[in-house]
């Protein structure tokens, strides 16, 4: 599985339409999406799923009003339930010849929600649109397809992976009943080419996926992990982020893993809505070709996060995307995007 900073052919997003994901706040969300599309389209193709003809027409109006050039934006009619393509879209990997293969994991709405029939078919639609080979990973014990979400896996493109125990080993929102730590490590090796899996503890507070890695720890190159750390001991994220830091420090020089360089990002102050703590995290950035989109929250730490990411990814432009409204949907930039890696297949003529 290529790292996120490796070349993309395109970024896939799904146009927002499901009002219950942003109760009372759906209005501004399409305009945030237009800005995301504008920034990414300056660097690579943006493929947009629209749940209906009506939604496609509305998306076109908003994109045009926002000045989004249409030469690198394509819109497709594909029914969806929600917009979080990081989890419902397939994972792009390269086979031995360098050709792109889409791993179409089973999707069950994070073992939490009951409306996911359309999202479970997104992988088939994307594979057809992109004319890519699709494979459906299955359990070794014959128990059916593997349930996995892209927001739960983070790779360095060289055989290392970050995941959390909260996501896969907890008895809450169980994705694959009966699978053990060793089972997961074997399937990561088989399907994603992983040599070593680094297990962190918990994700961030407010994450309805129950422990996705992309809100807490990310690779920015093959040898560097950036971790979201809460320094205030009174904050709910403090203990869990310090535990994750200790785990990373322990493995940073372990054989087959290290040396790893560790960097940290702060969290913004708690973002609340109707008394609910939302999963606001700067770690939910998205790396496209030559640009990094970073969620911002009208917080003094926005500047710290933007500067830190700029230092860690000096060859990329860094663009902040206002995400206070977006995170009311319980996700931000990484959650809503899915990269399509560029094939390395060389066709001899």
What kind of region is each of these model predictions?
Residues 1-349:
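The feature marks the mature, well-folded catalytic cores of soluble enzymes
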């Amino acid at each position: 599985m290529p790292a996120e900073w490796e070349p993309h052919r395109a970024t896939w997003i799904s146009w927002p339409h499901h009002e219950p994901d942003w109760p009372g706040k759906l209005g501004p969300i399409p305009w945030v999406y237009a800005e995301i599309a504008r920034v990414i389209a300056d660097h690579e193709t943006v493929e947009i799923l629209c749940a209906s003809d009506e939604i496609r027409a509305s998306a076109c109006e908003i994109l045009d009003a926002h000045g989004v050039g249409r030469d690198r934006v394509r819109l497709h009619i594909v029914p969806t339930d929600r917009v979080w393509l990081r989890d419902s879209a397939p994972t792009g990997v390269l086979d031995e010849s360098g050709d792109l293969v889409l791993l179409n994991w089973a999707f069950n709405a994070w073992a939490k929600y009951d409306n996911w029939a359309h999202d479970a078919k997104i992988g088939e639609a994307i594979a057809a649109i992109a004319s890519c080979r699709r494979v459906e990973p299955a359990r070794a014990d014959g128990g059916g397809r593997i349930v996995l979400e892209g927001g739960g896996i983070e790779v360095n493109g060289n055989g290392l992976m970050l995941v959390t125990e909260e996501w896969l080993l907890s008895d809450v929102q169980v994705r694959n009943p009966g699978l053990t730590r060793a089972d997961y490590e074997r399937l990561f090796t088989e399907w994603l080419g992983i040599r070593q899996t680094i297990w962190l503890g918990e994700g961030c507070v407010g994450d309805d996926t129950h422990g996705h890695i992309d809100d807490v720890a990310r690779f920015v190159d093959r040898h560097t992990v950036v971790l979201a750390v809460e320094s205030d001991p009174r904050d709910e994220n403090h203990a869990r982020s310090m535990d994750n830091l200790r785990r990373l420090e322990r493995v940073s020089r372990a054989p087959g893993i290290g040396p790893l360089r560790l960097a940290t990002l702060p969290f913004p102050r708690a973002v609340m809505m109707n008394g609910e703590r939302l999963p606001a995290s700067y770690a939910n950035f998205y790396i496209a070709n030559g640009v990094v989109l970073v969620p911002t929250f009208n917080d003094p730490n926005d500047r710290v996060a933007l500067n830190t990411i700029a230092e860690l990814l000096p060859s990329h432009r860094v663009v902040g995307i206002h995400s206070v409204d977006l995170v009311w949907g319980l996700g931000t930039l990484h959650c809503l995007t899915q990269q399509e890696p560029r094939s390395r297949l060389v066709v001899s003529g």
